[in-house]
Amino acid sequence: MSKKAVVFSADLSYMEKLETAMKSLCAHQDQLKIYVLNEDLPTEWFAIMNQRLRQLDSEVINCRMSPKQFQSFSLPSDHIHYATYFRYAIPEMVEEERILYLDCDMIFTQDLSPLYEVDLNGYGLGAVVDKPTTIDGFNAGLLVIDKTWWQEHQVTEALFDLTREHHQQVYGDQGILNLYFKDAWYSLPWTYNLQVGSDKDQYLYGDLDWYDAFQGIPAVVHYTSHNKPWTSKRFNRFRELWWFYYALSWEEILLRKPILKQTYQDLVGEFLYHAAIYTNTADIHELETLLKELPDVAIHVLAHSHFGFNLVQLERYPNLFLYPSFDPLTSRKVLEKLDVYLDINPYDEVDQITQTIQQLDLPIFSFEGTNHVENGETQVFADDQVQEMVAAIRDYLKRNEKKHGNK
């Protein structure tokens, strides 16, 4: 059986992201011929990858590109490298007739073999609609390419001509590709390119339906925009999925161990209990003490803004999880696993959260100087009684282990 052609385009700064994407791809299929368009990846890396991929009847090809003809083209954003234009040369670099181009900021959760069999209805390109940006253009992060069609229509030459003329007016190579193909491309199912990089922006735009528009786990998760999962900020869905494949060893992939069916939590371990704080200030009363004294309690801190450094520096405690500019989906996921709520942020309450906690019938622990509960039960301690609060939380969690299904 012939190998299936896959193409990535990367530079040295993205080598780690490229390898993570390759891990997720190889975890679900073999017999791949992976072409990497690049100008600076070390030859040693290719040698190591080929040694590993050989066991999957796969290989990786070092396709060196000259930057001269690409460096003068405009880039739509500072997180995009001119290597994105390398894909123009795919028909010249790849031998196979059906080609699958993939961005490096993607994770693949299933076998992509069906894309090699899909009927493009006579078109030279298959892609996914660029949701939520447009309803008629496509996102260029995943492309199914008919090499013969591209060669017959001299697509590469046409793309270079269009780029020289329009590169300052359109969104990089994606804009050029859309300009060339217009309506003459085949629309693939949304599952093959779900752009979760848009999560934060859609929330800020007030598009709360965006989170429920796609249900389940897509075949391809695309971390578009600046909001990448490898940054310190938690903005998007499926962030932990990227870290799962990042942490997965090649040995586990090559041996097809059962761990492939597990999750990020299975790799790093799950906390026994969960607490939350919704805040609009980084000055959270006695937070560091609680982090120290309750190491088996994950404390999730959510805010509608970014966090000050006095709070960020507390991330040295592994049980602290920060969610700046949180969205409704993030809030919902935190609340679903909550055991207790810590009403310890001074100043105004956020989103009337204590009312929500009361509706969930969860206990609230507070200090006299931070208490936001006017009516209802809450355990309130003097501002200097943090150890008493710690003892009360421990006692509650111990008494309610079975109730909350905790271990």
Report each predicted region and the residues it spans.
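A glycosyltransferase accessory/donor-loop signature
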Residues: 1-4, 8-10, 17-20, 147-272, ...
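Active-site-proximal specificity loops/subdomain of glycosyltransferases
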Residues: 53-92
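Conserved donor-nucleotide/metal-binding helix-loop-beta segment in metal-dependent transferases, i.e.
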Residues: 108-135
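Conserved catalytic-core segment of nucleotide-activated headgroup transferases in glycan assembly
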Residues: 268-313
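Conserved active-site histidine-acidic residue motif and adjacent donor-binding/catalytic loop
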Residues: 304-305, 320-334, 350
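Short hydrophobic beta-strand element within catalytic cores of glycosyltransferases
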Residues: 363-367
